[in-house]
Structures are given as C-alpha cells and as structure tokens.
C-alpha cells in the first residue's frame, strides 16, 4: 500500500485507512483510483444476470442471495476506490464478510433436502458477521478484517476440496479452476502491496498503456471476481446435481460460463 499522491481530486482528502498502490486522480479528477474502480464491473454485471437467470429457473433463494451479494461487494468496492473515503471502505469490506457467509451457507447445505433451512448454521454465520462488524468498527485495523475474511475463504476451500475429493470427483475442473483463479488474484494483491514502490517507478518509465497492466490491485478485482463467480457456479452445480437435476456449464456468447439445468425426466 502507498500513501496518496499530492493531487487533489473531486472527493477531497483521503479518509480511508487504506490507500492502494494505484496513483490517485491520475486518469480523471472524479475517480481517485480509476483502474481499481472500473475493474469492479466484473463483480457487478455478471452476478446480476446470474441472479436474473436464477429467478427464472426458480433457484433456491440462497443462490439468488449469493449472486446479489457479490454484486453488492463490487458496488461497495467501486465506491471505495472511487472516493477513498472511510465510509465507502466499510461499504466494500463488510459486504466481503457477509457475502462469504452466504457462500459458506450454500456450500454446507448442498446435500440437504430442497428448500431446507439450517437455522443453527444461519445463527452461527450471523453471529460471526455481527462480531466481526462490531470489532472492526471499533479497532479500524485492516489486518483484522483480512484475517476474518481469510478464515471464511479457507473454510470454503476446505469444503470445496472435500466435495471434489469424496463426493463429486468429476467437478474437480470447475472447483480447482475457481480456486486457482482466486489464488492468482491473491498473489497479485500481495505483489501490489509488497512491491508498490518498484511498480510505481516502473510505471513512470513506460508508456501508460503498458503501465496499466501493472495495476495488480485491479487484477485482484478481476480475478477474485471471476473466482467468486465460478465458486457460485461450483456450489450451484453441486446443489442441483444432488437434487437430481441435470446441470451443465455452458459458455454464453462463447465466453462467459453459466450453469444451465433442467429437472430430471420422470418415467
């Protein structure tokens, strides 16, 4: 992470506890971190279409919530990187916790009867979210949020590995692709933090078009957005397979993956 550059922008002084490696107000005076902002589109638009498709397919509400939660994270991150205001930072970081809790619920309820509700798990995840929120609002320490978020992601990873190892081995491709994409994003996030000064110096010496490719926090958004979306597909595929539907991963326009399914034929 790096301190803000001495360039004044529309949103005024930075009040967030984090300021990332992208130089502030370089592309436009109306967006503090332009590339870190627009890269959130991958977390906003595709999940909206996923939720719409889910409503049409009459999916369980938990999966509609998962899609919409990812969209909320993207919108919050957009507002945070656009303004670098503390309130907008919370709008980014807290939904990361809430969305992951929804993902955890979906993953651990894949093998239950249709429309069942696990109130004990719901209460546990609600209590976790409430505790993290309360503590984070008081301590305002980003590392605390990162550890709490990491614990949820680690839980999802373990559950996913269990499913592709012991339950549906033929889903390894989708499960491990989701994990690999997410971990690659995490790697670039760390590179952006650790080598920020070197990256900034490099961007000063190369054409802007080339410099954009080193905005690794923006790549973190793209890769974790895609990884999270693929995780929802993996969870949804697992669930509908258990319910004896016939899910298939199809590529819309030959590019974007989506799960399409239909009820099993009755004889």
Swiss-Prot record:
**Record-linked InterPro entries:** ACER
Disruption-associated phenotype = Homozygous knockout mice are viable and do not display overt phenotype with regard to fertility, body weight and anatomy. They exhibit a decrease in ceramidase activity in brain, liver and lung tissues leading to the age-dependent accumulation of unsaturated long-chain C18:1-ceramides and the concomitant decrease in sphingosine and sphingosine-1-phosphate. This is associated with a premature degeneration of Purkinje cells and age-dependent defects in motor coordination, skilled hindlimb function and balance capabilities. Knockout mice also display exacerbated systemic inflammatory response.
Which residue ranges are assigned to the Cytoplasmic compartment in the record's topology?
Answer: 1-33, 83-87, 140-141, 195-215
* Topology in membrane: Multi-pass membrane protein
Spell out the subcellular localization from the entry.
Endoplasmic reticulum membrane; Golgi apparatus membrane
Question: Is NAD among the key words of this record?
Answer: no
Q: Which cysteines link up through disulfide bonds? A: none
Q: Where does Zn(2+) bind?
A: 81, 217, 221
**Record's protein name:** Alkaline ceramidase 3
